[in-house]
UniProtKB/Swiss-Prot annotation:
The lineage of its organism: Bacteria, Bacillati, Cyanobacteriota, Cyanophyceae, Nostocales. Residues 143-145, 298-299 are annotated as: Interaction with tRNA. It comes from the Bacteria. Keywords: ATP-binding, Cytoplasm, Disulfide bond, Nucleotide-binding, RNA-binding, Transferase, tRNA processing, tRNA-binding. Belongs to the MnmA/TRMU family. The gene is mnmA. This is tRNA-specific 2-thiouridylase MnmA. HAMAP family: tRNA_thiouridyl_MnmA. The active site is at C94 (nucleophile), C193 (cysteine persulfide intermediate). It catalyses: S-sulfanyl-L-cysteinyl-[protein] + uridine(34) in tRNA + AH2 + ATP = 2-thiouridine(34) in tRNA + L-cysteinyl-[protein] + A + AMP + diphosphate + H(+). It comes from Nostoc sp. (strain PCC 7120 / SAG 25.82 / UTEX 2576).
Length: 352
């Protein structure tokens, strides 16, 4: 019998993925990662629901303590980034370093299993012509999570299954209901796990970064107001600046060194190109010449036509056909050919 370890968060998606694979004849082992430090996190609602689902399905349930890894790779990563004036994207980092990598290792070393599965909405396809595993958008475009999975290596893609990739979200709920799963009607998470457990990103960051007052200035250096911490702002932000101006002003730069928030009109927050580092080429090998693609510079943004120019040291330059508003350092840029993820990386801070 084929064996698979399913990552269970306690939500409907991962629960249904486990049920589907169980029905397909897999020997399924549920695995929950204990991520958060703090009182009550060892018996959080998600962990309790995951255990209940395993009991319903009659499968084993393992819990792995990943709190120190999560602290290093996610909490410290976020705090360092925000403190330096960037807006990190924790989810892609978490998928690679906290979830998929450790899950594959644990499954292999502790459970004698070479396949894992999750409830992500994405698809994996092996291309015999190139010998590469390709990452594709999910059938349900509205739920597609390929943007957050761009950093998975070929080895991790080869070991992973996404049972929900060919399904609509409504089908997931229906299957969960048909199986009588406790999580069938469970609401979806609406924010980052850290935000949900702390109330807001501001509250989370203020636990680690002491608010420090400074100037809000325009691009000419004129003081327009005061802020209470650079880490409370992000590129492109308009609301909550607390300044009066005859025209809309947006955050165009976060100067953590001089503790300044720089604002300007919309044109100042618009760029024709950017550079990206820590690039991972997914469905194709790294090209030696520029390629055409469609890029997303944030999760819910529409793909925009772009020329991807390879640089040295796992970097690329993105030249947009049309100038883009609010390109945010620290966020992921992921480029596609249709539904196929070609590659992605982290947007760099702009050089002056």
């Amino acid at each position: 019998m084929k064996k698979v370890v399913v990552g269970l968060s306690g939500g409907v998606d991962s629960s249904t993925a486990a049920a589907i694979l169980h029905n397909q004849g897999y020997e399924v082992i549920g695995l929950t990662l204990w991520l958060m430090k703090g009182k009550g996190q060892c018996c959080s609602e998600g962990m309790i629901d995951a255990a209940y689902i395993c009991e319903q399905l009659g499968i084993p349930h393992e819990v792995v303590d990943m709190r120190d890894v999560f602290q290093t790779h996610i909490v410290d990563y976020l705090v360092t980034g925000y403190g330096a004036g960037i807006t990190p994207l924790p989810c892609s980092q978490c998928n690679k370093t906290v979830k998929f990598g450790p899950m594959v290792q644990y499954a292999s070393e502790k459970l004698g299993c070479d396949r894992i599965a999750t409830g992500h909405y994405a698809r994996i396809r092996y291309d015999e012509a190139t010998g590469r595993y390709q990452l594709l958008r999910a059938v349900d475009r509205n739920k597609d999570q390929s943007y957050f999975l761009y950093d998975l290596s070929q080895d991790l893609l080869a070991a992973s299954l996404f049972p929900l990739g060919e399904m609509e979200k409504a089908d997931t709920r229906r299957i969960a209901t048909e199986h009588g799963l406790k999580t069938a009607d469970k609401p979806e998470s609406q924010d980052l796990c850290l935000v949900e457990s702390n109330g807001s990103m501001r509250a989370f960051l203020d636990k680690y970064i002491a608010p420090k007052k400074g100037d809000i200035v325009d691009t000419a250096g004129k003081v327009l107001g005061q802020h209470d911490g650079v880490h409370h702002y992000t590129i492109g932000q308009r609301k909550g600046l607390g300044i009066a101006a005859p025209e809309p002003l947006y955050v165009v730069e976060l100067d953590a060194v001089h503790n300044k928030v720089v604002v300007g009109d919309r044109t100042k927050a618009t760029q024709e190109e950017c550079t990206v580092n820590r690039v991972n080429w997914v469905s194709i090998a790294e090209p030696s010449t520029p390629i055409r693609a469609a890029v997303q510079i944030r999760y819910r943004s529409a793909p925009e036509p772009v020329t991807v120019i390879p640089l040295e040291n796992s970097r690329v330059r993105l030249v947009f056909d049309e100038p883009q508003f609010s390109i945010t350092p620290g966020q992921a840029a992921v480029w596609y050919d249709g539904n196929k993820v070609l590659g992605g990386g982290i947007i760099e801070q702009f050089s002056k």
